[in-house]
Amino acid sequence: DCPSSIGKPSPLQDTYWKLKKSESVQDQKKADIFSRRHSFSCLIQVIKDDHNKELEGKILNFRFGIKVWEKIQSELKPPIGEPNNPFDLLKGKLFSLKITKVSGFNNYDQSKFVDKAIPLVIPDEKGKLVPITEKTDKALVFTFLKEHSADLTKHAYKEWDQDTYNYVNQ
């Protein structure tokens, strides 16, 4: 976590901008070492997983990069067509996650939103997963989400201690 992500001074950011604004092409290339790698995360519900059937129906924290973020933005603000909020509990579209390897790195180019809207599914009295509807008790949905969602506090910003500042300033 860089302190600049919450508006605090950062020696990493200072070094990045010093190198980036340099007239030296070598320094500008070195700036890439200090540039940020954007990552995002959200809660998702696994609808189908052929490799891990036990994950189906579970709510997990999904961490992703810029490629998936751009796909989400295209759903929210499409160049043509109707916008769709993929996070809508009733009308969110299914996201088909297809990960391939390109030059040894995970590639998400083949992942896409499917035209089919899929609501959140919760277990009924018998444990069978059933889709929620507008008539589903909101308190039931809230309780399900609260009790079954991943703990996101471990992903919160972590303040640097003096050891971290000392290490970065070496």
Each PLM stretch: what is its role?
Residues 61-151:
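Extended serine/threonine-enriched, polar tracts that run as long, contiguous segments within proteins
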Residues 1-87, 151-167:
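OB-fold ssDNA-binding interfaces and closely related basic DNA-contact patches used
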